[in-house]
Amino acid sequence: MGGRGLLLLPVLLLLGAAGPRLQPAESADPEDPVSAERSLAWGPGLEAGVTVPVRYFYIQAVSAAGRNFSRSPPGRTQFKVVIKALSPKEVTRIYTPRPLDRNDGTFLMRYRMYGSVTKGLKIEILYGDQHVAQSPYILKEPVYHEYCDCPVEDPEVWQDMMSCPSQEPQITKDFISFPTIDLQRMLKEIPAKFSQTGGAIVHYTILDNHIYRRSLGKYTDFKMFSDEMFLSLARKVRLPDVEFYLNVGDWPVEHRKVNDTPGPVPVISWCGSVDSRDIILPTYDVTHSTLETLRGVTNDLLSIQGNTGPFWENKTERALFRGRDSREERLHLVKLSKENPELLDAGITGYFFFREKEKELGKAQLMGFFDFFKYKYQVNVDGTVAAYRFPYLLLGDSLVLKQDSQYYEHFYIGLKPWKHYVPVKRNLEDLLEKIKWAKENDEEARKIAKQGQLTARELLQPHRFYCYYYKVLQKYAERQASKPEIRDGMELVPQPDDRDSVCTCHRKKPLREDL
């Protein structure tokens, strides 16, 4: 995953999304000058073959003594990045905002391409007027933008290019219940069982790298989110031929146990629960924000890393909650807040489920998400299902107090209570006690917050979502007992029109003209 800056790494230094990990004793003095030469640069955005909507890489500020900065470097000099086509004959638009300062000595650089280049890119990373690490980084291969339809034919090659994990624990766990997948049974059972008038099931077939689907049930508008991700994935790698049912509703739907007769069927969903057997994908929320980073969304998993508020010691020592009334415990939070304002600041920003409570509890003003991190503690309480804000909260540098929940997302399996967050009982009866604990054990609370943030940075990298989606489709296809087909009522989901952008795919063989 790394660029050529990896050549500078000491033997004991690990690089990932979280950044180089050195012992605290080796941190640079905050007043030390930055060494451009000894600073580090790495990440998928320095690799030509890693095509994602917004490419990204990381920079670690290092002192002349070879020590990592753990705070923003002193002075007004900043890192800057210049990216352009390697060949002067190629012209493409590349949006390159300033690197995001993650307030821990590392910086996150994002760039979005609006056209492809066949000769490669030149990426200059500078501190002042000096090149950082191995800058300039020369990507000599074709570099494709998001909408260039140029899939890698060999999925093993693609997974290697993307540095996909060899195993995803949640995928392994989800498929234990389904050693084989009987498509014929699913064709008979799922439309009847799950797609009544109020259903939210979409029937997909992927064949020859084309996406086909039909909607089953009334509430399937959220297929727009699954469509865009499957299409994006198909532009990057040849997908297996596979046929499946995707639940685009909030709740998981398959609650039968393996030893039931009949047993469960493998419905794919965005959220799982301890009493269901659905196969889980990354939520529509994190995938859509990944697709629309630097364009159509304000909160995404990259931008939030440069907007985490004041340093830990300068944050407000209270817990914060803002959100809709989508679960009764959220109303209880507001009552606790009114009784204990010195510990908790909680408010409901919109009423739908419990409108009769608005007069009693009041309505809080909307609050910019980045402003959440002015507070030292964040309360995460379920909505209708798992609160989709949880990954964003983890990426900040506040301590997350997470309500015990029967629901989970695809990455929860990589988290542990008291290591990455502080657990709170389902009924919130110990919430105030946990806030008091955090205030009385500030250093331990800070360590948990930091470990949660570092782990989230690793698990929630955008390219990991593409790996995850592909592995679910691959595993599903491997277990199908019959060949997928385009069924009656299915329609082709076309790739978006991108005719105004340059896209010359070197992987596609030119058409031969008959002589």
Residue ranges of each PLM-predicted region?
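Classical eukaryotic N-terminal signal peptides for Sec-dependent ER targeting/secretion
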Residues: 1-13, 21
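Short S/T/G/P-enriched beta-strand
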Residues: 13-69, 128-160
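Short flexible loop/turn segments that cap and initiate beta-strands
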Residues: 50, 54-55, 61-97
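Hydrophobic beta-strand positions in extracellular immunoglobulin-like domains
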Residues: 61, 111-113
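Short coil/turn segments at secondary-structure boundaries
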Residues: 71-75, 96-97, 112, 123-126, ...
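Secretory-pathway glycan-assembly enzymes, especially type II membrane glycosyltransferases
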Residues: 89, 106-108, 115-120, 127, ...
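Aromatic sugar-binding surface patches on proteins
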Residues: 99-110
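Catalytic binding pocket for nucleotide-activated donors in carbohydrate/polymer assembly enzymes
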Residues: 366-494, 498-509, 513-514
